[in-house]
Regions:
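Contiguous, well-ordered alpha-helical segments that form the cores/surfaces of helical PPI scaffolds
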Residues: 158-171
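Conserved catalytic cores of very large enzyme subunits
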Residues: 1-154, 175-177
Length: 177
């Protein structure tokens, strides 16, 4: 018969052709801490942009995937930083400057996401009749059309992403993984 390992090998072959791998290992320590056997609501979920939705820092009793989602995301362009601070421009890598600017960008993006979150939270149920009027989000069925969204959006995620890791490494240090 087919084993889990056989399915993993097959999925690797398919991903190699499609170039869009999304693997989620429920038994990894990072995911297993939230998993309750037999409860599909506790299986980790990944959004299309690969945002991981499972842990809930607002309400650990609602560390589930259904009824939650990624509210906003912003991606940091790593190749730009790699070019700016890497050997591609002046044959010298400045890792200290790279990580300093990366830290500054992450703080900037965090602040931007929190500002966007506040804007979203000040909207009302009637602004999103399909998403929130259908009781799709956690606790949204408890709200009236004129209620603000913080009570449901607090369960969502905000994501700082990045693009171009291999290209960044190539321009920063001359090689990638």
């Amino acid at each position: 018969g087919i084993t889990v390992y056989d399915l993993l090998k097959l999925s690797c072959q398919v991903s190699a052709k499609r170039l869009f791998p999304n693997f989620s290992f429920l038994d990894s320590p990072f995911n297993f801490q939230f998993y309750k056997e037999g409860d599909v609501n506790t299986e980790v979920g990944y959004m299309g942009c690969r945002t991981r939705v499972i842990g809930n820092s607002v309400d650990p009793d609602k560390a589930i995937t259904p009824g939650r989602g990624n509210l906003s995301f912003t991606s940091i362009n790593l190749p730009r930083l790699g070019i700016k601070h890497g050997m591609v421009n002046d044959n010298e890598t400045n890792l200290d400057a790279f990580f300093e600017e990366l830290g500054e960008l992450m703080e900037f993006v965090k602040d931007q996401l929190l500002e966007r979150f506040e804007i979203q939270c000040n909207r009302r149920i009637y602004n999103f009749p399909f998403l929130l009027g259908q009781g799709v989000w956690i606790d949204s069925e408890k709200l009236k059309p004129t209620d603000k969204l913080r009570k449901v959006l607090k369960h969502g995620t905000l994501t700082i992403g990045f693009i171009g890791l291999a290209e960044c490494l190539k321009s920063l240090i001359g090689k990638h993984h």
